[in-house]
Amino acid sequence: MTAPTESSPFSPADLARHRLSPQEYRRITELIGRHPNLNELGMFSVMWSEHCCYKNSRPLLKGFPTTGPRVLVGPGENAGVIDIGDGLRVAFKIESHNHPSAVEPFQGAATGVGGILRDIFTMGARPIASLNSLRFGPLEDARNRALFRGVVHGIGHYGNCVGVPTVGGEVYFDPTYSGNPLVNAMAIGVLETPEIVRSGAAGIGNPVLYVGSTTGRDGMGGASFASAELSDASQKDRPAVQVGDPFTEKSLIEACLEAFRTGAVVAAQDMGAAGLTCSSSEMAAKGGVGIEMDLDLVPVRETGMVPYEFLLSESQERMLFVAEKGREGELIALFERWGLHAVVVGRVIGEPLVRIFHSGKVVAELPARALTDDAPVYPRAVLPEPPAAILKLRAFDWHSLAEPTDYAEALLTLLDSPTIGSKSWVYRQYDHQVQNNTVIVPGAADAAVIRVRPQSFGPGEVEAVPFTERGIAATVDCNSRYVYLDPYRGAMLAVAEAARNLSCVGATPLAVTDNLNFGSPEKPEGYWQLAMACRGIADACLELMTPVTGGNVSLYNETQSDGRTTAIYPTPTIGMVGLVEDIHRTCSQNFKSPGDLVYLLGGGEPTLGGSEYLACLHGVAAGEPPVLDMALEIQVQSVCRLGIERGLFKSAHDVAEGGLAVALAECCITGNLGLDAVLGANHPRADVVCFGEMAAAIIVTIDPCDQVACELWLECSLAERWKLLGTVAAQSFDLRVENRDCRISTSCERLKTTFEQAIPRRMEHIPVTEAPQR
């Protein structure tokens, strides 16, 4: 079509409020052959937002590997689905709720959990676990403490009330997140329906059902809000934050799963971002059909709502179904039995349009593809080389920095870092045992492990499998400082660490869901970070054979304050799931018995570049991140999994932030045991040996009775890439560096107190001088 010749009814200010550029408006008029009305402009505003259409990232996402022998559903549906054998299928996905959580932390985080759970059960899967990846500014700041407290409370409240265990996650703290926290929520479910539920509408004349809660004005324009930078004025956007009701969500889960098992549901889509607009247009476009709806039939919680508000509302706990004609009454009765609304609001039509009625009039009529597939895409030029500022940071010479005069105090300083310290303040607010399937609880290992129960497909129907020992392991990982210094290598390291964490509990990595949290793609450096990180994820996933089944992109994570714009560290969070063949053969990180032998498997070249040691003790974020030897990484992970499967390894823990000294201390703290060990002097500086970070490194313990057999096996499997470090002790922590005047000798109680108080003392605003003695 061609653009209309008459002048636009909308001013530049109108378009700016809808976050549409003049060029995008012209494209709209070309697609529909006329000027849109206000309702239609609002629909385009949300559907063409970065949050919904990925207009800046879509070309980059095409580089991800998305297929594999276990992948049943890849990107494009509500969640990815994989086959884990024994007739069991698992759905999983990660999504962000960053901007809402910055404005209203409790509701922003709570509805983030609710939204990701709906993505899971919309596929026909019962949610069995959730995880989260969180980023905040330093807790010394009162506003950051308030955001942290609100977000954790919101996650705990929603997850606890809805009855889905929060089994794991990660929390990082850095000044770049002070104005823009990150809240990424991941959920996992096991399919309870014979067929995977799809979202493409089908069957001309089939009724369209609105089910769930009522529609109000909450969350108005939330998708557009989530696609803009935050500023000092963002607090005025509180109406763009949704309000959740976990008890309604619990009923919705049960009602939907029961409805799917009847076979009366042709297609289903949850109403998340962009509400009715997104659910109707995506269902129509995916099915190659149209949908018409009458807004007068939509259940409401507020009076006087106009079509614009209906179409852009993001009220929670709502779904849109296409039902088999003649069976809508059966579904309505089912939902009413669960105390939920279920109303026929429209029908599937042959014309590929979304047609909206209100008060007997057509108030919006748009091609479904114009709202979805025809959204603009902006392939941008990638900088041919890193920005000068990044090159300068990478060239930082940390060799000139003074080494610690007291290595024990240096270790305690790292354990007191909220990024490294215990996250028990967080996970003790979560119910991680509800459903009674959690095999490994938060804080006990490098990944969560959840039992998978046999699934019944309905009354009188055969279970998927009569009995299984299988379980699912899950983790979320990303060292965003690495990604800031080197987006490509940092993203690869994030994927490798996620796989390593799964391997440390005995799980085989299977597939990935990613959450790309970045700044503005319109800035050359921002797009370069995004593009290079996507390449890193793609290459690492290919090497590890972990296809990407879906995810989320959150851009414009920048804060404008006092005329200055600050972007977050680029944070491509990797959610990864793995298969545990036997839940009775898993591994935790804690040392088990005095006298056990402690080994290091693998271990690349340690470096202080981008390390927590540099950040905590020197206030520096610079240098080259660790080098990743992917062949060694794969080899070390394979050995770790096999050692756990054989019952040889009693504990396993990967070496991450803080290096070997911190990893060993964590094993002691969680096991209430000590250590007597010597680190090989593989670097002239003792602080690099103790606190340098590396990839492909795992600490394991064995029973001394198995020493000869174990070392013969390690020699065959890893050649010289392993080392006996020492033994587990009863109470004291004694760590030395070979041929160096360096010794860390302290009590485990001192380590534990410092580690466990890292977050609580800051949340209680206790100065270091008044904190428990280290």
From Swiss-Prot:
GO (cellular component) term, any one: cytoplasm
Keywords: ATP-binding, Cytoplasm, Ligase, Magnesium, Metal-binding, Nucleotide-binding, Purine biosynthesis
Keyword Metal-binding in annotation: yes
Gene3D superfamilies recorded: PurM-like C-terminal domain, PurM-like, N-terminal domain
Lineage: Bacteria, Bacillati, Cyanobacteriota, Cyanophyceae, Gloeobacterales
Biological process (GO), any one: purine nucleotide biosynthetic process
Positions contributing to Mg(2+) 1 binding: E95, N552
Listed name of the protein: Phosphoribosylformylglycinamidine synthase subunit PurL
Record bears the keyword Magnesium: yes
Subcellular location, record wording: Cytoplasm
Subunit structure: Monomer. Part of the FGAM synthase complex composed of 1 PurL, 1 PurQ and 2 PurS subunits.
InterPro entries assigned: PRibForGlyAmidine_synth_PurL, PurL_linker, PurM-like_C_dom, PurM-like_C_sf, PurM-like_N, PurM-like_N_sf
Enzyme class: ligase
Pathway: Purine metabolism; IMP biosynthesis via de novo pathway; 5-amino-1-(5-phospho-D-ribosyl)imidazole from N(2)-formyl-N(1)-(5-phospho-D-ribosyl)glycinamide: step 1/2
Domain of life the protein comes from: Bacteria
